[in-house]
């Protein structure tokens, strides 16, 4: 493998055995691609904004004299960029402008004669835009729109599993689900009649809908039944025989063949053998006794040819009298319906009998009554209602997906078709459900991923936009019908408010628009790849049963079977598997390698769940020889959702990678294959809660996906193009781009500005640090700067800690964790948290609030950290209760006492008419002010601090743009100098030229002169561009802010809090092994090895066997080996000054070559000495290794690594007790494990209260830290005290410490008086109970004797 210069800095040794056929696709593409489809202009008009406009326009007036047509749309440029939107608290969006054409027709002239056409661009609201990282900035906060897994439109057949009826009979049903419009259900009742429901309303006999579709009884019977033909002879009937129809019946008469010999005697059951005999003898007619026809149903109406009287109506039961009538009327032939109990039920026939309607109008009226009960039906209204239900394109749409699913399920060959239903569609569904009831077909599995599809951002935004447009359409239609249209323009007809409101509501408050989880890069990526079955149009937690939540065979390679939340949402929220993507219909697909005649090819094809069922697919870990031919005889594979064994020649596809079935979070767990699934689930979920530490450290034992994840998440800065690093400082990196990657006429410079110390959604710190130096070559995709939780471009969520598995004096009982003081001293788990506190000055009824340092009744010391505007200085260290922003609020006028009047006369007005409402630091917080921002409403005078901040921002902008200009100018000038050199100027001449003269030299060579002139033009453009950019920036900084109504000023103060690790913090490994720190032990008391090195953390070995997450033990062993190898390299580097690099080179080479069939090839010999030295220095702390899930390091390889590191292959060491110096009685497993500090910090949870706020009705203390509440003393706690007979303790708990109002105030008094007695009274909750009983009308009074 070829490594770039920056990748050579640290290479992760990979134990993977399988060749990487396919790289993991870009992880955020599900979000970005979907939204791109929404905003991109689509000429076909099938999706996105274009589709929404085309579906609503043109809007015609009621009279038809005018219409509003849609021409095209364009999205403008956003006013602020993403960072500015976050700071100002506004939405990152672009204005949508639509070109509309208003056409007026001439009433007098012929139809369609145009009188006037007006075209105009109309503003239609703002559309939020997606940032490059797949998020939206809504009101200044980053949000993610989670994709939804919903039931695909189409037709589904199901049954009730025998739960509806007490008899346990299975009742089948069919449901046509459109993308939008009314649902149509067909269902059987226990008596086997077929019913229809529209939108889950009351049921009607199913034949009503057929009558409404203009089918007569005769046509209905012909659609659903075969006929049996009889010829009427004097006293017998001759039946046309179809032998197959007799199977399973009991013969009620002798069945004879053409010769008259008896084949089946009366009373015998007719079997397949008899039928074969009948077919052999070619018997086509059979004489049957007259009684045979009794009880059968006529297939058509029989009419007396003379009188026209109906003798036997269609679908009526035939009796002997009817037969006699027919004979009399001279009717010689009779058709009946072919019905048998087994597989040709009389369902439609029975349904027709209970159908009250006889013609189309009655059927329409019946449907109208069901849909609109209580309204008097008219013919037109009934027709219009039925037409609009399923046959109108405005009200009903199956969508492309729905039509495809519908046609495939009903075996209609074409995948395309109309979005509305046809008569044939409805009949086909009814035929199919009868087919299923007859036992010829199976019901569908609704949890199959072929029946559930993904709805992503773009599609949901389009739907919301369409909802807004439909609201506008109604208003436009009314306006077109009113008033004089000659004066009006399209602008006057359209009100953009409903559209903006619909879009805003979706992005701001939809259940699927979520506050982004920004704990660390992994949590961001997982949140964007999340697939939820909840939300509008989806399931609800309460209704979702076990089947929906369970892992389904079709999840393989599409949804992760491991990563899902614990708790009520389990199985309803899933994560996309690593390689999965959605196809054009919205179904999930996963890639497979094609296999031809037992040989694996490199062709990769994506298959959806529907397609996958047809093929035989082998797993990725099968054995193959060097030619890619399968070795084994029988190969484990999947076919039609079942696992089975097949021959190599039968296999058609094979998985692309063993990690294909799991999500990115799960594939970050090394040795996942050795962990129990429940613990792996916890491990995957807890990695998302890891807080970025002060100094990130790459995991020694990883899985090889860390780099992909860090780069795709967007928290690191990756090079857009190759080149050489030209300049680096803490906030900017400049890359001089390679000539061959430049576009013509472009300055060859890329500037990357870094994000410094900003706050994330979870209050953690986002900070980017450069990890490259000047002069280094870079290629596209190289990591230039690390973000939070990344280390040299690798995801680094925690720290590598030296761990011992042993008990230690009960301090690691029940998953507690004992850590060494050294961990705290070295700041290994120190994290920075940034809090944003805001102070808002409003305009109140009594006057406006004011931000000022002149606060009544506050001492000088409290104001020491404020400037003259009353705002805290940057860099001030503050603690709980300190004033951050001084603010005073006008107080209502009260009647003044004479003393107050005197004070007023002496001290002036100010002192009393305002009250202090300053912003103070919350109680438990202590930290440093790192930033202050002041937002002032337009027209309100800015204070001194606001002006200072503005000037600082302007100066910064000038400096940034100036430096950018300088760098770009230098790029242009250096190219001009090169040009002059090539044209014959000497270096001395060029050096002597002033900067401004370089571009105005005269060259004899004409082409070079033109080139120089082009460069001069480019320079002018740069200058103009700089002035323009600076002016825009300056205007943005100085303009007033758009604040909420009634708000004059907002001051935001950012407070950085440094949190060291302490007892009570929650930590975890990557295998679901979580625990709480119980004690921070002095270094000298920790167990140490024979070299005197103490361990960092002591874990309880009892946490491993019962939880079956053995992966952590293997990780510890491999971690020990990786660290040991690092120590050896460090020792060799110490010696290399004398011995040279040969030893280091051969040792590193040995390490990278270790292992069986390992795919990775690192050509250490091709490294220069400098490169090798840099690599070796980066490996000193331990060589990072990758052990991919299901394809990782084997036990043998771990032992080889331990040997290379010079450690015992058992992975166990002798340890000594730090307190006594005695050796522990047996060797202990010691090694390195990657530990994470989770965002459950004791500082955020610790809380105490003596007195505080009380609930209004019950008068009991509130609950929770946020309300400064008390601890709940519930019924179980009451039982505990009762069990001990602690009557007085119980009494005070239920009275004075809770809701005895008088008792608790009396307690104060008693304590002050030194009288430690309590007088419990009546608890308020008792009075509440009395009042509740009285509200029932029962007078209850307390007798206090």
From Swiss-Prot:
GO terms for molecular function: DNA binding; DNA-directed RNA polymerase activity; ribonucleoside binding. InterPro entries: DNA-dir_RNA_pol_bsu_ext_1_sf, DNA-dir_RNA_pol_bsu_external_1, DNA-dir_RNA_pol_su2, DNA-dir_RNAP_su2_dom, DNA-dir_RNAP_su2_hyb_sf, RNA_pol_bsu_bac, RNA_pol_bsu_CS, RNA_pol_bsu_protrusion. Its EC number is 2.7.7.6. It catalyses: RNA(n) + a ribonucleoside 5'-triphosphate = RNA(n+1) + diphosphate. GO terms for cellular component: DNA-directed RNA polymerase complex. Keywords: DNA-directed RNA polymerase, Nucleotidyltransferase, Transcription, Transferase. DNA-dependent RNA polymerase catalyzes the transcription of DNA into RNA using the four ribonucleoside triphosphates as substrates. The RNAP catalytic core consists of 2 alpha, 1 beta, 1 beta' and 1 omega subunit. When a sigma factor is associated with the core the holoenzyme is formed, which can initiate transcription. This is DNA-directed RNA polymerase subunit beta.
């Amino acid at each position: 493998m070829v490594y770039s210069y920056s990748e050579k800095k640290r290479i992760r040794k990979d134990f993977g055995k399988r060749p990487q056929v396919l790289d993991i696709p870009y992880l955020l593409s599900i979000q970005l691609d979907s939204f791109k489809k929404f905003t991109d202009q689509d000429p076909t008009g099938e999706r996105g904004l274009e589709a929404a406009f085309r579906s609503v326009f043109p809007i015609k007036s009621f009279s038809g004299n005018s219409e509003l047509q849609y021409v095209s749309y364009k999205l403008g440029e956003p006013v602020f960029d993403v960072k500015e939107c976050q700071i100002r608290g506004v939405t990152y969006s672009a204005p949508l402008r639509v070109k509309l054409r208003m056409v007026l027709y001439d009433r007098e002239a012929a139809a369609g004669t145009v009188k006037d056409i007006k075209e105009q661009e109309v503003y239609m609201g703002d559309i939020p835009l997606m940032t490059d990282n797949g998020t939206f900035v809504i009101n200044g906060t980053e949000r993610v729109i989670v994709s939804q897994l919903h039931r695909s439109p189409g037709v589904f057949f199901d049954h009730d599993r025998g739960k509806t009826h007490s008899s346990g009979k299975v009742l089948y049903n069919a449901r046509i689900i459109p993308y939008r419009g009314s649902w149509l259900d067909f269902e059987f009742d226990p008596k086997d009649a077929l019913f229809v429901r529209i939108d889950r309303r009351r049921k009607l006999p199913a034949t009503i809908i057929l009558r409404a579709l203009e089918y007569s009884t005769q046509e209905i019977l012909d659609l659903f039944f075969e006929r049996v033909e009889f010829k009427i002879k004097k006293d017998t009937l001759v039946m046309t025989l179809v032998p197959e129809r007799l199977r399973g019946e009991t013969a009620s008469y002798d069945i004879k063949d053409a010769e008259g010999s008896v084949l089946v005697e009366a009373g015998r059951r007719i079997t397949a053998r008899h039928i074969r005999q009948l077919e052999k003898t070619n018997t086509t007619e059979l004489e049957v006794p007259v009684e045979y026809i009794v009880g059968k149903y006529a297939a058509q109406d029989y009419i007396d040819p003379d009188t026209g009287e109906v003798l036997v109506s269609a679908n009526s039961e035939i009796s002997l009298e009817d037969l006699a009538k027919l004979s009399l009327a001279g009717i010689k032939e009779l058709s009946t319906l072919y019905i048998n109990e087994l597989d040709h039920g009389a369902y439609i026939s029975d349904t027709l009998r209970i159908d009250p309607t006889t013609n189309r109008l009655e059927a329409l009226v019946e449907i109208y009554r069901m849909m609109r009960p209580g309204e008097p039906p008219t013919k037109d209204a009934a027709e219009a209602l039925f037409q609009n239900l399923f046959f109108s394109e405005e009200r009903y749409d199956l969508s492309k997906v729905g039509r495809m699913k519908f046609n495939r399920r009903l075996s209609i060959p074409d995948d395309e078709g109309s979005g509305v239903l046809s008569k044939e569609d409805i009949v086909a569904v009814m035929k199919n459900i009868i087919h299923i009831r007859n036992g010829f077909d199976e019901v569908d599995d609704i949890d199959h991923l072929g029946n559930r599809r993904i709805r992503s951002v773009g599609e949901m935004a389009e739907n919301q936009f369409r909802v807004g447009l439909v609201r506008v359409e109604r208003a436009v239609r009314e306006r077109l019908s009113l008033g004089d249209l000659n004066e009006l323009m399209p602008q006057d007809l359209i009100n953009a408010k409903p559209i903006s409101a619909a879009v805003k509501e979706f992005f701001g408050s939809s259940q699927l628009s979520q506050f982004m989880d920004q704990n660390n890069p992994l949590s961001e990526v997982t949140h964007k790849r999340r697939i939820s079955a909840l939300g509008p149009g989806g399931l609800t937690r309460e209704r979702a049963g076990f089947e929906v939540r369970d892992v389904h065979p079709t999840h393989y390679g599409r949804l992760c079977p491991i990563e899902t939340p614990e708790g009520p949402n389990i199985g309803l929220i899933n994560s996309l598997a690593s390689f999965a993507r959605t196809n054009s219909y919205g179904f999930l697909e996963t890639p497979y390698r094609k296999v031809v005649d037992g040989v694996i090819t490199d062709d990769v094809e994506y298959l959806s769940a529907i397609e996958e069922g047809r093929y035989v697919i082998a797993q990725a870990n099968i054995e193959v020889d060097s030619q890619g031919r399968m070795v084994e005889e029988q190969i484990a594979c999947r076919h039609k959702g079942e696992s089975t064994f097949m021959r190599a020649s039968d296999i058609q596809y094979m998985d692309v990678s063993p990690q294909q079935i799991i999500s990115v979070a799960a594939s970050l767990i090394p040795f996942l294959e050795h962990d129990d699934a429940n613990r792996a689930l916890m491990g995957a979920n807890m990695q998302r809660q890891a807080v970025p530490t002060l100094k990130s450290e790459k995991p020694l034992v990883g899985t090889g996906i860390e780099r992909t994840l860090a780069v795709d998440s967007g928290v690191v800065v990756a090079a857009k193009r190759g080149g050489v690093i030209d300049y680096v400082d803490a906030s900017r990196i400049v890359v001089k781009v390679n000539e061959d990657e430049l576009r013509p006429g472009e300055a060859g410079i890329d500037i990357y500005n870094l994000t410094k110390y900003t706050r994330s959604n979870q209050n953690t710190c986002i900070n980017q640090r450069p990890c490259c130096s000047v002069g280094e070559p870079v290629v596209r995709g190289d990591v230039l700067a690390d973000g939070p939780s990344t280390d040299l471009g690798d995801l680094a969520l925690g720290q590598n800690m030296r761990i011992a598995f042993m008990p230690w004096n009960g301090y690691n009982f029940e998953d507690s964790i004992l850590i060494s003081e050294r961990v705290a001293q070295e700041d290994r788990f120190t994290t920075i948290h940034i809090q944003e506190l805001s102070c808002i000055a409003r305009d109140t009824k009594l006057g406006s609030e004011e931000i000022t340092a002149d606060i009544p009744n506050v001492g000088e010391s409290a104001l020491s950290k404020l400037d003259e505007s009353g705002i805290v200085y940057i860099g001030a260290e503050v603690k709980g209760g300190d004033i951050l922003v001084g603010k005073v609020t006008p107080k209502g006028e009260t009647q003044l006492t004479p003393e107050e009047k005197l004070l007023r006369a002496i001290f002036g007005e100010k002192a009393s008419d305002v009250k202090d409402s300053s912003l103070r630091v919350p109680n438990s917080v202590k930290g440093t002010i790192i930033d202050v921002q002041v937002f002032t409403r337009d027209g309100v005078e800015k204070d001194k601090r606001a002006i200072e901040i503005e000037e600082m921002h302007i100066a910064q902008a000038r400096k940034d743009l100036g430096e950018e200009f300088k760098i770009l100018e230098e790029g242009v000038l250096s190219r001009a100098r090169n040009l002059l050199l090539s044209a014959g100027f000497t270096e001395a001449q060029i050096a002597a030229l002033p900067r401004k003269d370089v571009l105005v030299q005269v060259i004899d060579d004409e082409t070079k002169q033109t080139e120089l002139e082009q460069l001069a033009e480019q320079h002018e453009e740069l200058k103009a561009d700089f002035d323009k950019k600076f002016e825009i920036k300056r205007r943005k900084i100085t303009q007033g802010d758009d604040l909420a109504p009634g708000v004059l000023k907002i001051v935001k103060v950012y407070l950085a809090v440094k949190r060291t690790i302490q007892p009570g913090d929650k930590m975890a490994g990557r295998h679901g092994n979580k625990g709480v720190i119980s004690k921070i032990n002095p270094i000298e008391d920790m167990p140490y090895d024979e070299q005197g090195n103490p361990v960092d953390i002591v874990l309880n070995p009892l946490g491993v066997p019962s939880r079956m997450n053995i992966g952590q033990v293997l990780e510890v062993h491999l971690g020990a080996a990786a660290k040991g190898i690092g120590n050896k390299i460090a020792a060799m580097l110490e010696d290399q000054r004398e011995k040279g690099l040969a030893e280091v080179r051969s040792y590193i080479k040995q390490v990278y070559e270790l292992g069986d069939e390992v795919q990775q090839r690192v050509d250490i010999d091709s490294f220069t000495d400098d490169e090798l030295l840099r690599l070796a220095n980066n490996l000193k702390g331990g060589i990072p290794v990758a052990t991919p899930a299901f394809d990782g390091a084997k036990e043998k390889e771990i032992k080889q690594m331990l040997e290379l590191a010079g450690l015992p292959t058992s992975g166990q060491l002798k340890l000594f007790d730090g307190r006594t110096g005695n050796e522990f009685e047996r060797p202990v497993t010691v090694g390195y494990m990657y530990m994470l500090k989770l965002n459950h910090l004791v500082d955020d949870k610790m809380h105490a209260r003596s007195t505080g706020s009380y609930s209004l009705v019950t008068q009991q203390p509130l609950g929770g830290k946020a309300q400064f509440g008390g601890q709940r003393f519930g019924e179980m706690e009451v039982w505990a005290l009762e069990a001990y007979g602690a009557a007085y303790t119980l009494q005070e708990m239920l009275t004075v410490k809770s809701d005895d109002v008088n008792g608790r105030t009396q307690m104060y008094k008693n304590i002050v008086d030194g009288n430690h007695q309590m007088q419990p009274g009546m608890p308020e909750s008792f009075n509440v109970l009395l009042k509740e009983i009285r509200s029932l009308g029962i007078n209850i009074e307390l007798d206090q004797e």
